[in-house]
């Protein structure tokens, strides 16, 4: 049995057509189903529907053989115990710093609000900048507006939400897309099956990219 961990939302919507190219189609709509384990048209493949931030954990611990996770999630929650054989080139966005439009660069210790605490620590450590990291789980744009933080670090797609709140994207930390990740033990135990799936998905990605 091959188990693939996915999260609902944009990643799921963009991944399903790629899996379909490999003949893997869920037997019911994951967006509408309440089930968290969904069979597919291939008897030996099932989907696990989990939180986006939990995908690396399920795969690393072997509860899933493969998964699809954003590079931002892998950077924050760790992808060290996983193989990352393929960039699926879906759910693309940017991980950036942002601040109030026209605000001067703060001097001294910087206050940064983000849910990407580990990424923020590494980023500013590399710059030699002293920072106080304030962990938030949402509505990052609010933090600079009410003087909770000087800057935020967040995923930026169009930038419209930032601009609507008087903020502007500033420094690019990483370009983000969704990656296929594989459990290391599974890759050894089911190498032929998993490699075949990786190759098929790679062809689908390349074909879509050329088109």
From Swiss-Prot:
Catalytic activity: 1-(5-phospho-beta-D-ribosyl)-ATP + diphosphate = 5-phospho-alpha-D-ribose 1-diphosphate + ATP
GO molecular function: ATP binding; ATP phosphoribosyltransferase activity
Top EC class for this record: transferase
PROSITE patterns from the UniProt entry: ATP_P_PHORIBOSYLTR
Gene Ontology terms: biological process: L-histidine biosynthetic process
Keyword ATP-binding: yes
Predominant place of localization: cytoplasm
Pfam family, one: HisG
Compartment(s) where it occurs, according to its Swiss-Prot or TrEMBL record: Cytoplasm
Keyword Transferase attributed: yes
Record EC number: 2.4.2.17
InterPro entries linked to this entry: ATP_PRibTrfase_cat, ATP_PRibTrfase_CS, ATP_PRibTrfase_HisG, ATP_PRibTrfase_HisG_short
GO cellular component terms attached to this protein's record: cytoplasm
Pathway: Amino-acid biosynthesis; L-histidine biosynthesis; L-histidine from 5-phospho-alpha-D-ribose 1-diphosphate: step 1/9
Domain of life: Bacteria
This protein's UniProt keywords: Amino-acid biosynthesis, ATP-binding, Cytoplasm, Glycosyltransferase, Histidine biosynthesis, Nucleotide-binding, Transferase
Family: Belongs to the ATP phosphoribosyltransferase family. Short subfamily.
Subunit structure: Heteromultimer composed of HisG and HisZ subunits.
Entries under PANTHER family matching the protein: ATP PHOSPHORIBOSYLTRANSFERASE (PTHR21403:SF8), ATP PHOSPHORIBOSYLTRANSFERASE ATP-PRTASE (PTHR21403)
Role noted for this protein: Catalyzes the condensation of ATP and 5-phosphoribose 1-diphosphate to form N'-(5'-phosphoribosyl)-ATP (PR-ATP). Has a crucial role in the pathway because the rate of histidine biosynthesis seems to be controlled primarily by regulation of HisG enzymatic activity.
Record remark: domains: Lacks the C-terminal regulatory region which is replaced by HisZ.
Protein name: ATP phosphoribosyltransferase
Species the sequence originates in: Pseudomonas putida (strain W619)
